[in-house]
């Protein structure tokens, strides 16, 4: 996460630069994004505090062509009407991590293009997230191989954008999660959608897992229909309302599941 700084609202890039200690006009970051009406606009990032970029259309999409190493795929955040684009499998993992983060309310892909005021260097972050407390977060995936050539120039741009707009900035790398946790997230993410939520089933499942036990055993103890109860239990695990050891491969017939109260008792 990068540090944040005071947010200027004057709308004058020269005034902003003079008020920021040691900040020249060329160091001001500009943002290109779509207005609510769909018009492409460009402003200093310091003016974007009240812009709901998580609701805006992308300013960029990957071009697909034969022989390209990266892929273009899509992720639908739970409760969102629009899919978020992912240019690579690494970006897909970053989207899954955002979905899993309880701080994140919603997010979208590629809604803003950042550039220096003097026109030198541009970058489109992978994701823009709105947090539950109203703050904003930029998420970018760390490039690998030949794609990392411009990375030393991108990082200062992201850092400055975060400070001037008051955004968090996170760099997602594969090392952020263990292999087992990444695979568990991939498998359980299919149960993320709110349509699987059921208050009565949740009550019975919490009671069943008040003592740690394997998933299938606890589901059977609820007396609920097996298939629907399994789906609802997986949903609660994804939402982290039921706990598992994410760093071990999750096997429903063997892996222990418990409630937060049970986890305290185990400790």
Language model segments and positions:
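Electrostatic, structured charged patches in enzyme active sites and in nucleic-acid/phosphate-binding
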Residues: 1-267
